[in-house]
Amino acid sequence: MEFKFSAVVDPSTYQTQGLCDGLTVRYHKNTELEEIDCLRCQEHWREQVGPLGLYRGGLGHPWSGMSIAIPEALPERLGIVSYANELAFLHDDVTDIAKYYQGDEHNNDLKAAFDQVISTGTIKHAGSGKRALQAYVAKRMLSIDNDRAITSLKAWSTFLEKAGRQEDYRFKSEDDYLKYRVHDVGMLFWYGLLTFAQAITIPENELDTCHQLATTAYLHMALVNDLVSWDKERQSAAALGKDYVTNFIFVAMEEHAISEDQAQERCRREIQKATVDYLRVFEEVKARDDLSPDTKRYLESVLYSMSGNVVWSFHSPRYYTDASFSERQLEWMKNGIPKAQTSEGGASGVDQGEVKIHDRTINGHHAVTSNGTGTGSHDTLNGDGTAHENNSRDASIPGRTTNGISNSDTSLLSAVLQAPYEYITALPSKGFREHAIDALNVWFRVPAEKLAIIKSIITILHNASLMLDDLEDGSELRRGKASTHMIFGLGQTINSANYQLVRALQEIQKLGGPKSLLVFTEELHYLYVGQSMDLYWTSNLICPSINEYFRMVEHKTGGLVRLFGRLMALHSTNPVKVDMIDFSNRLGRYFQTRDDYQNLVSAEYTKQKGYCEDLEEGKFSLPLIHLLQTMPENHVLRNVWMQRRVRGTATHAQKETILELMKRNGSLQFTEDTLGILYGHLEKSIGELERRFGAENFQLRLIFELLRNG
């Protein structure tokens, strides 16, 4: 294995008690990266969860845990794996301190959060405690290496499913205990850390073999942990009123009726045996030609994890009260980590300047305001929040209401009226807007009842707009299924979509106060203005400028974002008042530009909506606007586009022709570059909001990172 980021440690500078003889110890050259992120994790824990007390984690002097156990971690990944490991230490201490029968609850919660981010791309309730920190870990890992991050998150979820599940079981034999301990030590957790840190990919067909070969190494690390943590675990057990300790030393004492010292010596012999056994395993691995280079690199890296774990453990303040921290670590603990390293959100290496084409800028935004009410940031809640009952019962006529329609008739009519809406609502959705609302509520702290109403309003309007969009655009597919009007026809679809405005208005009334209604009508107005611009250009073959295009996007796509942002600001319980207009407009521009790009290049999008659907519908998307403006005299382009108008649609061959012109002319690359800049603007807005609110929003950053990589 090639060594780029570490150096061999002089054996005279550390002690091992003979527990890793024959193994080399290496140490990372950039250990300050670990120190910064371990301390950052502790800061986040204090902010999000609570005080740490006398907590000791992965840091120490002269050796810190990740720098010596994964010495070849890529420098840009060392920080986040150190943060993740520190979070694991904090979680471990919580489950130790809690009543032992509650340990599963903590593991279940962490597992559920990892499962959520894998399956849905977000972590719900990330504004509370540990889940906010998990969202932070996931976001940073996904931003570095999406595929390996997902692999690690899946491995950690599986580990949490098994870890700590027998803490209330009194093991009778060493064999039974060791079988359990190999998994509980975090074989899969360490696998996730190590593969991500060193950018290793184990082929699927070699995964089981890899874990089997590494079992002895993980047993080694488990027993080292049992040896050095014996006093700590024994004290925790006594504090919890337990008469047993889930530790090899305790099991050996009971099984063989031996003293504590004898059991510790027995543990050392098992560790030494595991060292010899794994060295033999690795020698055999090197001679095999049926294993990939990455599998071999992983199994070799585990050697350094074994030796590093021994050296760190014997010098760690986590296990030894006389162990120390470095002067730099103590300085940062006292005064905070370097300010240049405190935020992950601002610059992303993307040029923050404007993108220009033919002197048309796409950076300017149109702030939507009306009579000074462009934001609800300084509004106060008026009214009692109750909805008026418009359909009171007429007691003299059973089964009737005062409007003369029977309840049974109303129910039937409602079912017919709602059927198209319920059809589109039942189609699979990633729920981006709902996740974004949850993330923003980390700042706004809108009461749960009002937040549910805001979500309901946005869901109703979003699905209604999709029904009308598909109908107006002639789209036959929505989320891989037949569009609503292809099932229910034009009339029923239009009627049901329009009725949703009534439902949304009824929901707005539940929020109480006139300002909610004002925000609602303003943003609904702009949403329809944006849609009309889009339809007008398509119908009349008018190619807008890029500025005009983004003005339309801010109305049409940004409208719903502004609506929920302004409603949340209006009903916020946070005393900090912030204008969400700029953020909402930037999100709208990014979201629509991404949609334009995905429509042309994404296989998944083709499956859900059809091949290059925007070209088929004649929409002026950003790539097409760029193409038409940079090739205004191209006869092939002009004639293909005119034929699409004549036919009312575009054939597969015509779409292929336009797509090829986009590739040759750089229109797709322009759109991709624009996305990078728009994402930079979005990150800048998030950073500004974090500074205004005085709190980082890991969940929001995770959502956008997944959106960028999705």
From Swiss-Prot:
Protein origin, superkingdom: Eukaryota
Region entry Disordered, spans: 365-404
Motif (DDXXD motif 1): 92-96
Binding-site positions, Mg(2+) 3: 469, 473
Binding site for Mg(2+) 1: 92, 96
Gene3D superfamilies listed in its UniProt record: Farnesyl Diphosphate Synthase (1.10.600.10)
Region feature stellata-2,6,19-trien synthase, mapped onto this chain: 1-327
Region of interest (Geranylgeranyl diphosphate synthase), ranges: 328-709
Pfam family, one: polyprenyl_synt
Biotechnology: Variecolin and its derivatives produced by employing P450 monooxygenases from other fungal terpenoid pathways exhibit anticancer activity, thus, the skeleton of variecolin could be considered a privileged scaffold for developing anticancer agents.
Ligand binding (dimethylallyl diphosphate): 478, 556-557, 592, 599, 609, 619
UniProt entry keywords in alphabetical sequence: Isoprene biosynthesis, Lyase, Magnesium, Metal-binding, Multifunctional enzyme, Repeat, Transferase
Protein residues bound to Mg(2+) 2: 92, 96
Biased composition (Polar residues): 368-380
Annotated positions binding Mg(2+) 4: 469, 473
General function of this protein: Multifunctional sesterterpene synthase; part of the gene cluster that mediates the biosynthesis of the sesterterpene variecolin. The first step in the pathway is performed by the variecoladiene synthase vrcA that possesses both prenyl transferase and terpene cyclase activity, converting isopentenyl diphosphate and dimethylallyl diphosphate into geranylfarnesyl pyrophosphate (GFPP) and then converting GFPP into the tetracyclic variecoladiene.
Domain notes: The characteristic DDXXD motif for binding a trinuclear Mg(2+) cluster is conserved in both the N-terminal terpene cyclase and C-terminal prenyl transferase domains. The Mg(2+)-binding NSE motif in the terpene cyclase domain is not completely conserved, since the asparagine residue in the is substituted with histidine.
Quaternary structure and partners: Hexamer.
Protein name (record): Bifunctional sesterterpene synthase
Organism: Aspergillus aculeatus (strain ATCC 16872 / CBS 172.66 / WB 5094)
Upper classification of the organism: Eukaryota, Fungi, Dikarya, Ascomycota, Pezizomycotina
